[in-house]
């Protein structure tokens, strides 16, 4: 099955990512699995990828704002989420330090690291992100300070906070993010696919 997946490469993985996935399939981890592994299992069952499931969820929320200017932070190399939303008619700009414009089908592209202390969100109405890792706290702080609507699915493992400390586990990290939001955001749990439950941090107002 992995050979068929590698040939189809539905999630546009690099050769290294495909090689790492094959190794993980042959030698599964006992505690955690990679996002690529989850998408592989979804594919073998004929189910949508995580990006497609999150895009479907977000698009229903964004339908209330058909002309909104949307920024996806942490879109990755191929900006799959942004492209799916653009195909649905939304006005999307994609941002990531590794985004490759040859994959983005002409979408506005910003190749940069997102930093809440320097990034001006005035050109955008809504910010979205899917598991943006170290950018998570930056997105939260930027949207709070600049009063922007946002939807962000969270990684299932903790990431360093801006001051450099590392939370002990995902729950401690989520609690920290809610404390930083100071009432601006709330955390919800969603079943976007049959395999996992996804934590989504969102602004309380707007959507």
Q: What are these model-predicted stretches?
A:
Residues 71-117:
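SAM cofactor-binding core of SAM-dependent methyltransferases
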Residues 166-207:
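Active-site capping/gating segments
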Residues 139-149:
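A short glycine-rich, Lys/Arg-flanked "PGG" loop and its adjoining helix->strand segment in the class I
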Residues 125-140, 156:
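A short SAM/SAH-binding and catalytic strip from SAM-dependent methyltransferases
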Residues 1-65, 80-83:
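S-adenosyl-L-methionine
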